Every structure is written in structure tokens, then in C-alpha cells.
Amino acid sequence: MTITLYNTLTRKKETFVPLEEGKVKMYVCGPTVYNYIHIGNARPAIVYDTVRNYLEYKGYDVQYVSNFTDVDDKLIKAANELGEDVPTVSERFIKAYFEDVGALGCRKADLHPRVMENMDAIIEFVSELIKKGYAYESEGDVYFKTRAFEGYGKLSQQSIDELRSGARIRVGEKKEDALDFALWKAAKDGEISWDSPWGKGRPGWHIECSAMVKKYLGDEIDIHAGGQDLTFPHHENEIAQSEALTGKTFAKYWLHNGYINIDNEKMSKSLGNFVLVHDIIKQYDPQLLRFFMLSVHYRHPINYSEELLEKTKNAFNRLKTAYSNLNHRLISSTNLTDNDEEWLAKIEEHRTAFEEAMDDDFNTANAISVWFDLAKVANYYMQEDNTADHVIKAFISMFDRIGSVLGLTLGEEELVDEEIEELIEKRNEARRNRDFALSDQIRDQLKSMNIILEDTAQGTRWKRGE
């Protein structure tokens, strides 16, 4: 089955057909690195990491690029407040970003370009827009001529007239039209700046992504993604800049994830109700936060509260328990049982259902429902008097398959004392029955979990390894 995805540009689901067969060029707007990331920043990182995983699962060669905005007004303000320079602050929070999203199971992009490392490409892009008549210089600033680009407003589905009615020129701005936006900003006293044909300054926010997409992925890409709040003006302006320069369709598909609400109220730094990722993962398993995010379709809003996270924890633990039980059941399984094919067929049905869910606009919520149903079937199977090891392994393999796409590792939980004693008793029984193969298998399993056994005249003793 082919993938269908919801394209913000057309406001409908479309069959995914990449520009080049078998290959996907994907760009995701990354964070402005002036502080630790909050859960709103984490959502696109998790969502689009999962999208990449599934595209690769389907056999696509994905070139995934996600940027860092390492210079802008917020960073300059943060650096001034901390008494540090902008590069020091941005480097600190880039490192923190990788630590946080890494804990959440996100792989690094193929490239993480930074604005300060791509100033030449940005200046060249702006210069070309001026030459083509789409931009103009005004007292050291450079602005994009919004009205010169006929397609402006197509992503956010707003007309120029609608936009004009609410546009104003602020005091100090040197643009010709209220709808024009800055490509380059003249330097202010004491601010970090770069030499340019228009004097010292720094780039506007929107031009950064256009320039880096062109440099690292080319004139046209398959997927451009980010948070819903970036649709306008950021992504709208990216389209205008890039398509004005190249005359080509900038991005074929636009994906946008929904907002996060805190206790039913929109998360906002101005309201002070934001939650930092590095605070949450001190209290909870980082995988739980990822599971929580993926339990809702990426385009829908998420309501976050610790109460909801606790409920999600209970659900997540049910999957982990089923996975743990499957691994333990391998010890006592036989080679063949009477109805193996029936159970294997059920597992295959769940593979199909999982792929159907993900093919439908990357519906991780439905995919997780399939996972729970698979766990339910596995639990039924383990109630059988006899289980076949190849069927158990097929269940485990399907758990792993789903987990690898969703970026979730159920793993083996640390055994509690009662479980260890139970396994030791099974081993003792195997030894009494002279089933030394099973005895060794249990010993090796415990050893892999860092449980050390010592057989003495008084019985088997155990301890946890250092």
C-alpha cells in the first residue's frame, strides 16, 4: 500500500510520490537555541523522526536536514542577560538539545546546519533576489517585495488583500510596503554582525531556511515540515523567497504538527506554563514522553498534564509487560505445536494493520492501537499449555518491528526478586530432570540480566552484578 499524507499546501490527503523514485529530501525547521527545549519543541523532533523512520522502513533513502537558528533577537537578548557572547550561548543549548532529543529516542539528522556557518550562502541568496527584482536595500536593511511574488499566501490560504488589511509599518522600519519582510537587518550597536554588500548586519529569520535548503538539498525538496505555528509567516515567506529565486516548486509536501496545551490551556512562555524536556526526563522515562506524544495523531493538539502522563505510563507498562513475558516464555517453549500457522497468520495480520495505519498520514495513534491488540493476542497465546519458540520469536519480532519505527524500545525490565527466584526454581527443576540444556539456558538468561548464580551444597544463591 502506498503512503498518503495530508499536505498543508492543498489542505487534503495526497498519495506520496517523491520527486526521485526511491529517494526523499526532507527538511525540518529546528529550534532557536537560546534556552532548553520545552515539550512543544520536542513534538516536531519526535514526530518527524518517526516519519523518517517509517519512510526508511518502506525502503526510501531519506536525506534528512534540520537546522539550528543560532543567531537572532532572542539569542542576542539571552546572551546579554547572561553576560556571554552569542556563540557561547548557542553552543551550550545545541549540546543540550542533542542530549534531550537523544534521550527521547530521536536520531540525529543527516545534517544540522547552523546559520552562522552559512552566512555566505545567505548573503548570496539575498543578492540574487535583489538582482531579480524581488528585494530591495533600504539604509542597510534588505526587504522582500511581497507583492512581486504572485503566489504569496498560498500556503496559509490568505489573499494579499486580506493580509494588507492587517499590515502596518512599525516605527523605525524602512520598508516600502507594510507586507514586505526583512531578509537582512542592519547591525545595531553592540550586536553580533557580519560584513555584507549592504553593510554590517545579520540575516532575517525566514531567509535562513531558504538558503540552507538550497545549499544542502537543492532547489526542490519532497517534504518540508515543522510546527503548525510556523505555517505563517515563516513557511509562507520561505516559499516566496525560494520560488521567486528559482522559479521552481520549493517543497512538494508540507507537514505541520499540532500545538501542545498544558492543562487545557495553550502552552506559552508568556503565560509561564511551559514544561522543559530536561525537567520531565528527570522524573519519567524519556521513552514514556515519546510514547505519550505518538499516542495522538501528529496534526491534532495534545493536552499535557502529569495526570495524563501517569495514565499513559500504565498503558505503556502493559506493552512492556507483554514483551517481557514473551521473552521469558522462550525458555519453556517447544519446537512445534498444533496451531502454529493460525497464530503466525494473526501476527501477519497485525503487521498489515500497522502498515495501513502508518500509510494513512503517519497515524501513530492507530499504529499504537494495533500494537496493543498484538499484545492482547500474545497474552492469549501465552495462556496455551504449549507454545512454540518460533511463534514466540515471531511475536517478539513484530513488537521490535513496530518499536523500531516508533522509536520505542520496550526492552527487558530489571527482574524483581520474586521473578529471579521463580527462574531459579525452574532451573533447579530442569537439573533434577537432567534437562541440562534448559538449565544452561536459564543460567545464561540470568547472566545476561546481570544476575550471578552460585550453586552450593545448600542450594543456589544469587546476587546482582556490580
UniProtKB/Swiss-Prot annotation:
User: Is Transmembrane among this UniProt entry's keywords?
Assistant: no
- Any idea which positions bind Zn(2+)? 29, 209, 234, 238
> Known Pfam families for this protein?
DALR_2, tRNA-synt_1e
What does the record give as EC number? 6.1.1.16
Binding positions for ATP per the UniProt entry = 269
Give the residue interval(s) assigned to the motif 'HIGH' region. Answer: 31-41
Residues found modified as Phosphoserine: 270
Q: Answer yes or no on keyword Phosphoprotein.
A: yes
**Where's the motif 'KMSKS' region?**
266-270
Which GO terms are recorded in the biological process aspect for this UniProt protein?
A: cysteinyl-tRNA aminoacylation
* Complex and partners: Monomer.
Q: Which family does it belong to?
A: Belongs to the class-I aminoacyl-tRNA synthetase family.
This protein's name:
Cysteine--tRNA ligase
- Gene giving rise to this polypeptide: cysS
